[in-house]
Amino acid sequence: MVMENKFLFLGAPGVGKGTLAKQVANTTGLFHLSTGDIFRSVMQEQGALSQTLAHYMNQGLYVPDELTNQTFWHFVTTHQNELHKGFILDGYPRTLNQLEFLQSKLQLDQVFHLKLSDPQVLVARILNRLVCPSCGSVYNKQSKPPLKANQCDRCHATLQARNDDTEAVILKRLTLYEDTVKPLIEAFTKQGILTVIEAQLPLEQQVNLVQQLVH
């Protein structure tokens, strides 16, 4: 499959990776491909793949690499018209197995790793996070509060904090992320396609840095 402008955004939970990816997609016209959006789209289809995926998702189970790979590639091959100008991957690949599958199908042009030097800053961000259970919009009590307290700006549903957003759980998730992403970072570094972006920079500055490398 011939496709230009293939980019990946990496970052720990709560670092702002999704926000940056969406902003860059909006300014460049590239398609924003998040794992969650792909899963939700495929689950709405009729067929064995959607049923198998729903079995894991509806029970909150970990989706195996093989199924994740199959779901990702199914989405890509059935949305070629939307993706022909290029896309931004957000949340995939997460493991070496997923990376090996991806690179057997296509080659990434650039990888951006959004990184926070101080993990306590990230902990504070996540502890202040509010999520809309209806449309998935994400807010922050300090840096991105909703217009009306505890109400989603888009669909007006009541915002919620995640039950597992505690400092101990967050630090555990960060450690797990670092262990999981380390071999990916090493692989992308060897390939010469990794760019590290400091997550404490203002969003506009992050976008400008990315746009210098995204054509």
UniProtKB/Swiss-Prot annotation:
Disulfide bonds: none annotated. AMP binds at T35, R40, L61, Y62, V63, G91, Y92, P93, R94, Q98, R162, R173. Pathway: Purine metabolism; AMP biosynthesis via salvage pathway; AMP from ADP: step 1/1. GO terms for biological process: AMP salvage. PROSITE patterns: ADENYLATE_KINASE. Keywords: ATP-binding, Cytoplasm, Kinase, Metal-binding, Nucleotide biosynthesis, Nucleotide-binding, Transferase, Zinc. Residues 34-63 are annotated as: NMP. Its main location: cytoplasm. Pfam families: ADK, ADK_lid. It is an enzyme of class 2 (transferase). GO terms for molecular function: adenylate kinase activity; ATP binding; zinc ion binding. It catalyses: AMP + ATP = 2 ADP. Monomer. Consists of three domains, a large central CORE domain and two small peripheral domains, NMPbind and LID, which undergo movements during catalysis. The LID domain closes over the site of phosphoryl transfer upon ATP binding. Assembling and dissambling the active center during each catalytic cycle provides an effective means to prevent ATP hydrolysis. Some bacteria have evolved a zinc-coordinating structure that stabilizes the LID domain. Belongs to the adenylate kinase family. This is Adenylate kinase. It comes from Mycoplasma pneumoniae (strain ATCC 29342 / M129 / Subtype 1). The lineage of its organism: Bacteria, Bacillati, Mycoplasmatota, Mycoplasmoidales, Mycoplasmoidaceae. The gene is adk.
